[in-house]
Amino acid sequence: MIEQPRVCVQVQSIYVETQSIPDEERFVFAYTVTIRNLGRSNVQLMGRYWLITNSNGRQTEVQGEGVIGEQPLILPGNEFQYTSGAVLETPLGTMEGHYEMVDHLGQAFRTVIPVFRLAIPTLIH
């Protein structure tokens, strides 16, 4: 039996007020992703897919190779962390998606990126 790779994804987001211009409907957010390899063999991140939704329901899809110009190899028990950003036209939105990955045998699999919120702090009580 082939063991399914065990990968955990966690995301933290923040509002970047210094780069935002609310009067021009420009709300900038940074998010930090931590990808942990909980399995017993290497995994490599090959690509990404994001679905970004603003509070008006407008959706944008983003996909491409790797993340921040890398296709990291993550060893068992290790993690890879990176920070990136998103610009919305509204002060509230969500992101979700998946990573395209390969295991140590070259078998492709997807790791889900759970939905997370992008919001200016004054909107969340």
Swiss-Prot record:
Q: Which InterPro entries match?
A: ApaG_domain (IPR007474), ApaG_sf (IPR036767), Uncharacterised_ApaG (IPR023065)
The record's section on Pfam families has:
DUF525
Q: Give start and end of each ApaG domain.
A: 1-125
One Gene Ontology BP term is: error-free translesion synthesis
- What PANTHER family does this protein's entry cite? F-BOX ONLY PROTEIN 3 (PTHR14289), POLYMERASE DELTA-INTERACTING PROTEIN 2 (PTHR14289:SF16)
Q: Spell out the protein name for this chain.
A: Protein ApaG
User: What is the scientific name of the source organism?
Assistant: Yersinia enterocolitica serotype O:8 / biotype 1B (strain NCTC 13174 / 8081)
Lineage of producing organism: Bacteria, Pseudomonadati, Pseudomonadota, Gammaproteobacteria, Enterobacterales
